[in-house]
Amino acid sequence: MNSSMIAPAALPIEVDLDLIRRMDRNGPRYTSYPTADRFVEAFDAETYRSWAVRRNIGGIRRALSIYIHLPFCSTVCFYCACNKVVTKDRSKGEKYLQYLFREIDMQGPLFRDDRVVEQMHWGGGTPTFFTMEQLSELCDHLKRHFQMSRDGEYSIELDPRSIDPSQMQVLRGMGFNRVSLGVQDFDADVQRAVNRIQSEEQTLAVMEAARGAGFSSINVDLIYGLPKQNLLSFNRTLGRVISAAPDRIAIYNYAHLPTRFKPQRRIADAELPTPDVKLKLLGLAAQRLKEAGYVYIGMDHFAKPDDSLAIAQRHGHLHRNFQGYSTHADCDLIGLGVSAIGAIGPTYSQNHRHLETYYDALDRNMLPVARGLELSADDLLRRAVIQSLSCQFKLSKRSIEIAYLVDFEKYFQEEMTDLKQMVLDGLVELDDE
């Protein structure tokens, strides 16, 4: 029997409905702690500049990571909560690039020439809204201002609907060696419900071309909890994705927040799976991927055992940041583009979220930093706890006490009390360590 056609009823997925009801609450994915809603406008461009310069001082050469936000999409996906601009006017993309070049011109001199870029990610939006010539021009502009590592990890998000497979070789020539493909779900009913019609053939053709071009890692994004999704249809999607054998698979939870994200108002509440079905969808995915040999990295990520994320996890070097899971824990992150988030030393910063204010700041020769945060000692301590739990699924109380000079049980007295019910529910194990 074709493994992609196994009936979900045959899969031992059991759900404690009472536990779901008690634990069903919204919460952050913790790509950062504190989360972005804690950022304040008092952290401005000058604060950012002073921290960037301060990080150059001393004998330690800290590596750099770069995130570039390319916000344009030609069509809207109803589930999307990203900062995006939906347009078919390509001239808007060219204008954006010219302003992005100006930001790069201002950011580059803030960092010492010997600080090498070891990691870079381009996200959106849809980066391939831009032509290959425009993307190549952006690459060249970056290289004029930043020293790129020869063996760095350079990734780009792709919409298989907006790129010809032959262009994968062009992207590889620019220096990209990792690619992330948005799939979400192959089921036709689900695709119509979220306004993202994307054939399996399109996706597989891009994946095959990426392998042929020499990309070292291919990631596929899926979403569970979308309208019209059910166990049978999602099981088929999982089977097809597993057969394509990407190196990494991210399975994100759909958060339905129509009051915050206007496109989500096009999704009917009645078509969304219930919380218990959502959990079964996640359980189904975890089981299918485990059976296929993938390693659970954490939160929403799975990877093949020989992938760098799985290797880093085994050696205790895994890290989580605004770009998701990463093997580069010690990099200062530079965010470029509208709404982009950076992390320099013990600070976070975010650029203006709207094109008009982003452009206005650059027209005034100012870095387009809108807000940010300097982390307190408490923030740093709690971030370390969350990092350990997110990346290693465990926490050494003693290591926290040594690193932060606290009595763990006293410092987290309230939290330890809250954990008691989770222990009784079998969700958490506690010991003296």
Listing of model-derived features with the role each one plays in the protein:
Residues 1-65:
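Flexible, acidic/Gly-rich N-terminal and inter-domain linker regions that tether
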Residues 16, 26, 45, 260, ...:
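Alpha-helix initiation and N-capping motif
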Residues 57, 63, 86-110, 115-409:
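C-terminal scaffold of the Radical SAM
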Residues 68-84:
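Local cysteine-cluster metal-coordination motifs and their immediate loop/turn environment
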Residues 70, 336-338, 432:
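Pocket-edge structural micro-motifs
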Residues 407-424:
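Short amphipathic alpha-helical interaction segments
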Residues 423-433:
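A short, conserved structural fragment
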